[in-house]
Each structure stands twice: as C-alpha cells, then as structure tokens.
Design a protein with these regions (language model features):
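Short secondary-structure boundary/capping segments
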Residues: 29, 76-78, 105
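Surface-exposed, charged secondary-structure patches
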Residues: 2, 9, 38-41, 52-97
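Short beta-strand segments enriched in hydrophobic/aromatic residues
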Residues: 33, 91-93, 119-120
C-alpha cells in the first residue's frame, strides 16, 4: 500500500522539477507536464497539445533566469483529491531575480504526477 502523503508527493515532484529548471533542460522540464495541459500566463495562455510546445515555451524563457544558480520552492498544498494536488508554490531565486508565485495543478498520470495547469499568482 502506498503511504506517501500528498505533501511528500509534491515535495518530491518539485525537487525533481527544480533540478530540471536549474539545469535549463527544456526536455526534462516538459516531462513534468501532462499533455494536454494549460499554461495560463496573462495575455499569453498556452493550450498544450504536444510536448514540444512546453519545451519551446521554457527554452524561450531561460534568458529571464540568467545568473540564477539556486532557487528554493516553498510549497503549500491548497487542495487535494485522489487524482489531483493543487500546490501554491513560491520560488525564491538568487542573483537578484524576483520571486515568483505560481499555482500548479498536479494530476496523476499512471504512477507519476504531472502538471496539468500552471497559473501565476501575485507575490
């Protein structure tokens, strides 16, 4: 019987996601996303229907994190079900890059978890 809590699942998920982000590995980042998925940025929503869309999105965003070598994810679970975890995550970066706060809906995909919806929040 799987006894991992949703908090543990989210922590492990975001530890892996953080490594992919810091490595600037668009392919590894994309593997953390479900297909279909929704990246809901203001004035630039992306309805993801192919893994390559997520890879392209993040490849184009790496420049805004120039100089960042460490980041910390503070995770707060705001809702959970057997198939979804909603996590309010504040990212604190080094190198003077502003903090970010995002709401992630993680969904179960077989034995793994993936991001189905990503929405920015006010910090």
């Amino acid at each position: 019987m799987d006894t991992m809590t949703n908090s543990t699942i989210a922590q492990q998920f975001f530890d892996s996601y953080t490594r992919a982000l810091l490595d600037r590995d668009a392919k590894a980042i994309a593997e953390h996303y479900a297909v279909p998925a929704l990246i809901e940025f203001p004035d630039h929503p992306i309805a993801v229907s192919e893994v390559s869309q997520t890879e392209q999105f993040f490849s184009g965003a790496f420049g805004q994190y120039d100089g960042v070598s460490t980041t910390h994810a503070t995770i707060r679970i705001v809702a959970e079900t057997g198939h979804s975890i909603w996590a309010d995550v504040t990212w604190t970066h080094d190198a003077g890059v502003p903090s970010e706060r995002l709401l992630y809906q993680l969904v179960r995909s077989g034995s793994d978890w993936r991001i189905a919806v990503l929405t920015p929040l006010d910090t």
